[in-house]
């Protein structure tokens, strides 16, 4: 509140000098009003942005309804880990794919890797594959992880986070089973279990390519 020297009449008295709130400052002017509105809009946008930045659960919702949504980011080509060239989900169309997001610093990823390796050995002759995708990991650390666990399934490097956000991935590990038609039929957010993967693969392998 701003104050200024002014004169006011008191009951039964004349005008007496004193420091009183300035009337000119008691009512906001047009500029202050505009600034206030702008600030309110900015706060609203920030709140909306925080809400929207959360994980995308639309894929989970569709899979829970057995809608078999199209696998996101099929055209995204990522560099292979430990070998030259790139690979995309589109290049694997017609195969059942177990898409697994992982990192060397992720303890649950280390625990579930043997499950994925056993699945890979089972899938080799069935036109299917496990496909790992590293998430926020150094290539050297990822390569060491693969060597230590003797993993034979291929992995790609999502260094620029081109694929993971399309699946709503913000925590590891996460696994998506994709059928021959390129549609997601099962999702595991968190450490994978062998019974879950076995059931999901049996369903995907038994399904049609359409």
Residue map of PLM features:
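Hydrophobic beta-strand core positions in alpha/beta domains
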Residues: 98-100, 132, 177
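Thiol/disulfide oxidoreductase modules built on the thioredoxin-like
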Residues: 32, 144-152, 157-210
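Structural microenvironment flanking redox-active thiols in thiol-disulfide oxidoreductases
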Residues: 110-149, 159-166
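N-terminal targeting signals for export/organelle localization
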Residues: 13-75, 79, 210
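A short beta-strand-turn-helix
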Residues: 70, 75-97
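Short active-site neighborhood of thiol/selenol oxidoreductases, capturing the structured segment around
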Residues: 87-110, 116
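Short, positively charged low-complexity motifs
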Residues: 3-5
């Amino acid at each position: 509140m701003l104050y200024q020297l002014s004169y006011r009449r008191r009951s039964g008295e004349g005008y007496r000098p004193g420091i009183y709130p300035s009337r000119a400052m008691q009512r906001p002017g047009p500029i202050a009003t505009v600034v206030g509105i702008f600030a309110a809009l900015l706060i609203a946008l920030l709140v909306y942005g925080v809400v929207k930045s959360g994980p995308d659960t639309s894929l989970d919702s569709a899979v829970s309804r057995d809608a078999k949504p199209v696998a996101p980011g099929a055209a995204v080509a990522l560099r292979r880990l430990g070998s030259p060239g790139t690979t995309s989900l589109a290049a694997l169309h017609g195969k059942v794919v177990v898409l697994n997001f992982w990192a060397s610093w992720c303890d649950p990823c280390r625990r579930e890797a043997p499950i994925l390796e056993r699945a890979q050995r089972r899938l080799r002759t069935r036109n299917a594959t496990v496909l790992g995708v590293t998430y926020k990991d150094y290539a050297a650390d990822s390569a060491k992880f693969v060597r230590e666990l003797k993993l034979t399934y291929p992995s790609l490097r999502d260094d620029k986070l081109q694929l993971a956000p399309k699946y709503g991935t913000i925590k590891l590990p996460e696994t998506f089973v994709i059928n021959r038609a390129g549609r997601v039929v099962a999702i595991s957010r968190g450490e994978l279990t062998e019974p879950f993967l076995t059931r999901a693969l049996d369903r995907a392998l038994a399904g049609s390519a359409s």
